[in-house]
């Protein structure tokens, strides 16, 4: 961990859920294909449940919940949400009760199946988006408060200044690893949904005064609102930490193929390509889309010579979309 980042974050409560540094792996075959050195930060190996980026955020979110003496954790997401499942699992591990407020079709596959196997309470609503789901989450919290409980609501994707600290911390880990292997990354690429991972990386890189670009590949609804959301979250995180006038470098590209969860031939072929060339398995909702974006931009020379892709996990989502993926292969 970089000492500057460690010093700034030491005042915030954190519960350790990741007992190791996730590795950075060079991808020689993909590198030859695109004409640049491609590395992957294996945050799919964060160690709890199915792994993934959300666990970094949960270290701070659940640490905050403990300090606030909460006894039940509420979070929101789609029925097949990686975030919702690992939140439920981590919270149960730490002794909390959990309620997942979800939207979508109830099918016993993927993460929803795992929710049920683990005995995590789920409530499924008809909601058009996560903002509407948050209203239901607030209703659940009020119901629990009336019963004398102390609920703690985690927003979609853990995207809050508290949760974003997880990727400020990760930026310090990446900086130290880069120093050890003698690589200064030109770009760090990550799938972007709720925006917390990209925001945290941009803040961490700014604190470290790195020239490395933080690049998000949007996997859902894209537009000026999304860009503003990430920028606002990054600024709020900087203020929360107590660091002013950060020179944030945030870039966001649209590789959603029109909507969140839409599977296309390009995504399916990217999953197969990376799996067969490097033995790394991507998912169809986040990393498959984001890596397709990386390949597209890297081939055009737009990401520099040294590129790091953060594998944010989500393997269980592959099983939810199996039929769609296979229809393109």
From Swiss-Prot:
The keyword Hydrolase applies. It comes from the Archaea. It catalyses: 1-aminocyclopropane-1-carboxylate + H2O = 2-oxobutanoate + NH4(+). InterPro entries: ACCD_DCysDesulf (IPR027278), D-Cys_desShydrase (IPR005966), TrpB-like_PALP (IPR001926), TrpB-like_PALP_sf (IPR036052). GO terms for molecular function: 1-aminocyclopropane-1-carboxylate deaminase activity; D-cysteine desulfhydrase activity. The lineage of its organism: Archaea, Methanobacteriati, Methanobacteriota, Thermococci, Thermococcales. Keywords: Hydrolase, Pyridoxal phosphate. NCBIfam families: ACC_deam_rel, PRK14045.1. Its EC number is 3.5.99.7. It holds the Pfam family PALP. SUPFAM superfamilies: Tryptophan synthase beta subunit-like PLP-dependent enzymes. The modification N6-(pyridoxal phosphate)lysine is found at residue 54. This is Putative 1-aminocyclopropane-1-carboxylate deaminase. Belongs to the ACC deaminase/D-cysteine desulfhydrase family. Its cofactor is pyridoxal 5'-phosphate. The keyword Transmembrane does not apply.
């Amino acid at each position: 961990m970089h000492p500057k980042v460690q010093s700034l974050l030491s005042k915030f409560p954190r519960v350790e859920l990741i007992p190791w540094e996730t590795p950075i792996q060079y991808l020689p075959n993909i590198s030859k294909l695109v004409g640049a050195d491609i590395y992957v930060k294996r945050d799919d190996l964060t160690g709890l449940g199915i792994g993934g980026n959300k666990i970094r955020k949960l270290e701070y979110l659940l640490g905050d919940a403990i300090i606030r003496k909460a006894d039940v954790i509420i979070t929101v997401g789609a029925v097949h949400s990686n975030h919702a499942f690992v939140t439920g699992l981590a919270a149960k591990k730490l002794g909390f009760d959990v309620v997942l407020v979800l939207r979508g079709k109830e099918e016993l596959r993927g993460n929803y199946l795992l929710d049920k196997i683990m005995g995590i309470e789920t409530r499924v609503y008809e909601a058009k988006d996560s903002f509407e789901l948050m209203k239901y989450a607030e209703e659940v919290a009020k119901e629990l408060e009336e019963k004398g409980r102390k609920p703690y609501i985690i927003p979609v994707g853990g995207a809050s200044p508290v949760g974003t600290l997880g990727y400020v911390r990760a930026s310090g880990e990446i900086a130290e690893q880069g120093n050890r292997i003698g690589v200064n990354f030109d770009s760090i690429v990550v799938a972007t949904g709720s925006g917390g991972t990209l925001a945290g990386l941009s803040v961490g890189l700014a604190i470290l005064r790195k020239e490395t670009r933080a690049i998000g590949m949007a996997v859902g609804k894209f537009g000026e609102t999304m860009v503003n959301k990430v920028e606002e979250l990054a600024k709020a995180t900087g203020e929360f930490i107590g660091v002013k006038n950060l020179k944030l470098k945030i870039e966001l590209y649209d590789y959603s193929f029109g909507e969140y969860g839409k599977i296309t031939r390009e995504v399916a072929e990217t999953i197969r390509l990376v799996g067969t060339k490097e033995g790394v398995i991507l998912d169809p909702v986040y990393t498959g889309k984001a890596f397709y974006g990386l390949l597209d931009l890297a081939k055009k020379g737009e990401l520099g010579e040294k590129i790091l892709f953060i594998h944010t996990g989500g393997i269980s989502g592959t099983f939810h979309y199996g039929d769609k993926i296979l229809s393109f292969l």
